[in-house]
């Protein structure tokens, strides 16, 4: 498989976000502020089932051979989140089944909780010979880190671990402990040459911010290989659509308010696109009346705080 034949949807969204930032702000501080506001502001929710009557017609013609009767859906738990896959077509069940196996394979390969994964081996030993797919994610992660001046950084893992977001044993770290751990955080500590991954200065990595985007692209590729023209996946807030709905209308994705509840910031109509956002209100803890969420600023080691 040539992994450069398709772009990771997660990467596309993050790169577009950062391009906007870079065009308007040449200074690191301003760029970081905008990124924090963007990241903390949104969380996407799929509305394909509940709001199907309102979609606009797209350029795609309504399918005469595919209908709701050709639908197959399945839910799984992987990559520490709940996922939903839906496909329409004669081979919909086969496509979803194969896609689920692929998700599970990638989860095992990228997971920091799997002792046999490339990531865990590198984190434990400081180096590892990695697979094509792991190498691809490392390369793309480093590219994003350079484009964002370190606002996106896969070496944030030790800080996430310190806060307890990886184990759910939450705590506010001591300031001196946090500063010491931050010394290990820098994408410049990561090097890759000919599939040899090296982590310097006791750095450790985690693909939590990029793996689901790559995975959703793989699912879309599998759907296409099985002749699926209409489909949707929701990988824990990473929503990607294939074609339109079977009636020719666009898929509808709501952007949920960061305050939670049933409030939405807006609804996007989309086809053959991904909608990926992140919000701090679903993964957080409270201590002494203060809420701490999981979107950590690599510069400070503390949860990102919007103005």
Feature names for model-found ranges:
Residues 5, 10, 14-44, 48-307:
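Mature catalytic core of soluble alpha/beta enzymes
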